Every structure is written in C-alpha cells, then in structure tokens.
A protein has these predicted regions:
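Short loop/turn motifs at secondary-structure junctions and domain boundaries
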Residues: 55-60, 145
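Acyl-donor (CoA/ACP) binding surface of acyl/acetyltransferases
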Residues: 1-33, 66-175
C-alpha cells in the first residue's frame, strides 16, 4: 500500500487506530456541509471498515490515506481515490477545519495525482463536487483539473436536490 511523502506531509493508509479521527471528520458539520447528511455511527463505521482492506492499484474499494503533519504526526485530513474503470479513478478528500486553507489539500492532492499517474496506472482522474463548494472547486482547479460539466439536481443533501460539478484531469495534461 502506498505511503506518499511531501515536504510537510505523510499520507499513509487508514488503520484501525484512525477510527476516532475518521469519526470526528464525519461528524463535523463544517467538514460534511457539502458531503453528506448526519449519519448514524454504525453507518460511519461501515464506511470506515470498507476502507481498511489491503489496497492495490486494481482494487475496487477506496484507497484512503490519512494526511498527517510529517513532524508532529497530527492527522489533518483524508485523501484517496477509487477506480471506476481500468484506468479511470475518482479522487476525494476531507480536511479538519483547523487544517483548511493552509495548502495541505493542494500538497496532498498533488502527491496523490503523482502516484496515480506514475505508479497507479491511471490515465484519467475525476472528481464530483456538490455545487457551492468553492474551496474544493478551487483546490481541483489549482491542481490542474478542468471543470467538465454540471449535473443538475443530481445529489440529495440536507433535504433538497443539489447540482454536482464534474472535474477531470488527464495524465497527459498533468504538470
């Protein structure tokens, strides 16, 4: 399983002892505003457990990496991707409120893209972002993703339908 290193970060596979951090992200209204409604702990635990099995480049489950400060080992967020086709994968990321706006998302997403394109056998990365989530949109654009479209009223969240913004990044376009 990959471990990605950047000057400030260590991104390593989710482990059993990451449960409390995973739960704290999933229960934080600010973090989950554009992601999901409140869920029972049992549902969050099922999502956590689904990300624990050993991952390899052709796995059908999410590669889930805990983004940590490289010196203090403090967990800051999660990043990863999931294959949808042979050489296409969807990226995702969540960061704790205190870790937002400090460049950790960009640094870890660049490391993830580097890995996906150089080692993971990925030709195309995609992302789906709930419309209105400007921070995620800006992060994806800064990383080189292109907004390719918008799905109207495609995601049910907080009691109403929301549009989804669709992003893509091709290996040959990635710098």
């Amino acid at each position: 399983m990959p471990e990605l290193l950047t000057p400030r970060l260590r991104c390593s596979p989710l482990q059993l002892d990451d449960w409390s951090f995973f739960l704290s992200l999933q229960q934080d209204p600010q973090v989950m505003l554009y992601v999901a409604d409140n869920r029972p702990i049992a549902d969050i635990r099922a999502a956590f457990d689904a990300r624990l099995p050993l991952w390899s480049p052709k796995s059908s489950h999410w590669l889930c990496l805990v983004v940590r400060d490289r010196q203090s080992h403090t967990p800051l967020g999660l990043t990863g991707y999931c294959h949808h086709d042979d050489d296409i994968a969807e990226v995702g990321f969540l960061f704790a409120p205190q870790a937002q706006g400090l460049g950790y998302g960009y640094e870890s997403l660049c490391a993830l893209c580097d890995y996906a394109f150089s080692t993971g056998g990925i030709r195309r990365l995609t992302a789906s972002v709930t419309a209105g989530n400007q921070a995620s949109k800006q992060l994806l654009l800064k990383t080189g993703f292109i907004q390719e479209g918008e799905l109207r009223e495609s995601y049910w969240l907080h009691g109403r339908w929301h549009n989804d913004w669709l992003f893509g990044l091709m290996r040959h376009d990635y710098q």
